C-alpha cells in the first residue's frame, strides 16, 4: 500500500437511496463503457493528485457499490476506504427518533468517516 499520510483525501458522500431518482444513481451507468457519474469525478481527482478516496455508503448498497464504482476506483490505482452512514451510528448520548428512516445529512456523514481522515481532506457532495 502506498504511503498516503500527507496526501489529500477525497470523501464522497454516496449513501443516498435515490428515492427521487428511482434507483441507485451512484452506480447507474451513464458513459459509453458503463461508467457512472462518480467514475468521472474519480478520474479527475486521481489526475489532480488524490490517491485515497473514502466512500460514505450504506450497508444496503455495499455489494453493488463495491463491485462497480469501488472496483473501478481500485483498478485505477486509488486507495479505497469505506465508511457507513446508518441511522443507528450516532455520537454518544444521541438516539434515533421513533419512525425516522431518512439519513441524518452531511454532518452525520462526515462524522462516520472521521476515523479514515487525515488532513487535508476534500469533500465531494
What is the predicted role of each segment?
Residues 17-18, 89-90, 121:
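Feature marks short, surface-exposed loop/turn motifs that line or immediately flank catalytic pockets
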Residues 115-121:
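Conserved small/polar residues in nucleotide/adenosyl-binding loops
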Residues 107-114:
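Short, conserved alpha-helix that lines the donor NDP-sugar binding/gating region
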Residues 83-85, 112:
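Conserved beta-strand termini and adjacent loop/short-helix elements that scaffold enzyme active sites
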Residues 2-71, 80:
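N-terminal glycine-rich phosphate-binding loop and ensuing alpha1 helix
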Residues 77-83:
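A contiguous, low-structure linker/loop signature
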Residues 86-107:
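Active-site-proximal specificity loops/subdomain of glycosyltransferases
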Amino acid at each position: 500500500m502506498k504511503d498516503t499520510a500527507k496526501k489529500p483525501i477525497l470523501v464522497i458522500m454516496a449513501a443516498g437511496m435515490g428515492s427521487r431518482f428511482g434507483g441507485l444513481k451512484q452506480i447507474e451507468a451513464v458513459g459509453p463503457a458503463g461508467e457512472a457519474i462518480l467514475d468521472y469525478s474519480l478520474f479527475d481527482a486521481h489526475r489532480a493528485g488524490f490517491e485515497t478516496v473514502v466512500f460514505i455508503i450504506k450497508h444496503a448498497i455495499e455489494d453493488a457499490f463495491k463491485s462497480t464504482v469501488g472496483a473501478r476506483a481500485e483498478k485505477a490505482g486509488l486507495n479505497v476506504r469505506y465508511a457507513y452512514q446508518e441511522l443507528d451510528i450516532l455520537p454518544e448520548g444521541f438516539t434515533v427518533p421513533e419512525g425516522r428512516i431518512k439519513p441524518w445529512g452531511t454532518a452525520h456523514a462526515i462524522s462516520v468517516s472521521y476515523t479514515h481522515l487525515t488532513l487535508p481532506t476534500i469533500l465531494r457532495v
